[in-house]
Amino acid sequence: MITDTCILHIEEVLELLPHRFPFLLVDRVLNFEKGKFLRAVKNVSFNEPFFQGHFPGKPIFPGVLILEAMAQATGILAFKSMGKLAPGEFYYFAAIDEARFKRPVQPGDQMILNVEFIKERCGVARFKGIATVNEEMACEASMMCARRKEI
């Protein structure tokens, strides 16, 4: 179980991210430093709607949603690092590279999302993300998000 100080509760996460149930995949932020890193939690519950079909009798958290959870964590770090958006702007998930899956994530797991700010240029930020369960790597990827006008 995590014993770190909770820095951002769900109410604050909801203020930063546009996602809502069933697509909000960050439950709380444990720690962050602007322009450096963010550590967040996703508690994986059997009640998640996708477990009905992924996979019946052997529920596994979809890998694409692990990546989405890390992308949402990078979005929070981007908001905290690069500041508030101007009217009509939005942070878009722009790219993912070198994604690797190392272990399945299952109901009952607590997934820790660690994202690290690498660099920012012209409104495009690069991040490194690692998702772990019980300190064992489940997924890693390089990601980018872009600050752009809303489409």
UniProtKB/Swiss-Prot annotation:
Keywords from the UniProt entry: Cytoplasm, Lipid A biosynthesis, Lipid biosynthesis, Lipid metabolism, Lyase
Family annotation (Gene3D superfamilies): Hotdog Thioesterase (3.10.129.10)
A GO cellular component entry from the record: membrane
Transmembrane segments: none
Protein's GO biological process: fatty acid biosynthetic process; lipid A biosynthetic process
Chief subcellular location: cytoplasm
Enzymatic reactions: a (3R)-hydroxyacyl-[ACP] = a (2E)-enoyl-[ACP] + H2O
CDD domains the UniProt entry points to: FabZ (cd01288)
Active-site residues, as the UniProt record annotates them: H54
Organism superkingdom: Bacteria
Subcellular location(s) of the protein: Cytoplasm
GO molecular function: (3R)-hydroxyacyl-[acyl-carrier-protein] dehydratase activity
PANTHER family in UniProt: 3-HYDROXYACYL-[ACYL-CARRIER-PROTEIN] DEHYDRATASE
NCBIfam families in the cross-refs: fabZ (TIGR01750), PRK00006.1 (NF000582)
Family: Belongs to the thioester dehydratase family. FabZ subfamily.
Chain's role: Involved in unsaturated fatty acids biosynthesis. Catalyzes the dehydration of short chain beta-hydroxyacyl-ACPs and long chain saturated and unsaturated beta-hydroxyacyl-ACPs.
HAMAP family in the record: FabZ (MF_00406)
Protein name, UniProt field: 3-hydroxyacyl-[acyl-carrier-protein] dehydratase FabZ
Organism from which the protein derives: Blochmanniella floridana
Gene: fabZ
